[in-house]
Amino acid sequence: MRILLYLVSIVAANVVTAAFAPLTMGMFIVPMGTFLIGATFIFRDLVQNKYGRKKTYMFIGLALLLSAVVSSILGDTLIIVFASELTFAIAETTDTEIYSRLKLSMSLRVLYSGIVGGILDSAIFVVLGLSPLGANFLPWGAVPAAILGQVIVKTIIQGIAALIIHQTNNMSKYTVAS
């Protein structure tokens, strides 16, 4: 089930981003798929927690392939597909390695690895995919707000997930202790 949630969240993020206009909140520009991208880091952490780091890379590879196919079907340009795939590979690998190396509670590993992964995901994709360096959808002046808007949303999602995981783990400890 964890693997399915991980893969479906990636496909859904691509579809939602293509289907809906970005959300504009003041100066911030947030593609609608951003809400699901934050979740992909959490689902990937759950996959890794169950299957281990080595097998998780196999699922990341499958997700990478699936994402490229879906992006191509949706009509994304080659530069967007390339930027998306490179961003995904870097952000997911970084999240995986941080999650693996931290010797903290699961909730804190999810939080910290997800925040770093989210920052990388936001910065790399906006610069390589959306700025004048990429597909030129955003002028350079809008790039910082686009990155920051995505980072804020992804960080909030990571924080909520960390709280839920923390509460769930505390409740299960209490239930076992009773």
Where are these regions (language model features)?
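Hydrophobic transmembrane alpha-helices
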Residues: 1-54
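Cytoplasmic-side transmembrane-helix entry/capping segments in multi-pass membrane proteins
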Residues: 1-5, 53-63, 105-112
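Residue-level recognition of pore/gate-forming positions within transmembrane alpha-helices
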Residues: 11, 63-65, 88, 118
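Structural signal for membrane-spanning alpha-helices in multi-pass inner-membrane proteins
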Residues: 13-18, 67-74, 125, 129, ...
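Interfacial aromatic-anchored transmembrane helix boundaries in multi-pass membrane proteins
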Residues: 21-32, 67-87
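Membrane-helix exit/interface motif
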Residues: 43-47, 68-74, 94-98
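Transmembrane alpha-helix/helix-exit interface in multi-pass inner-membrane proteins
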Residues: 47-53, 57, 72-80
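Membrane-embedded alpha-helical hairpins and interfacial helices in multi-pass inner-membrane proteins
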Residues: 77-178
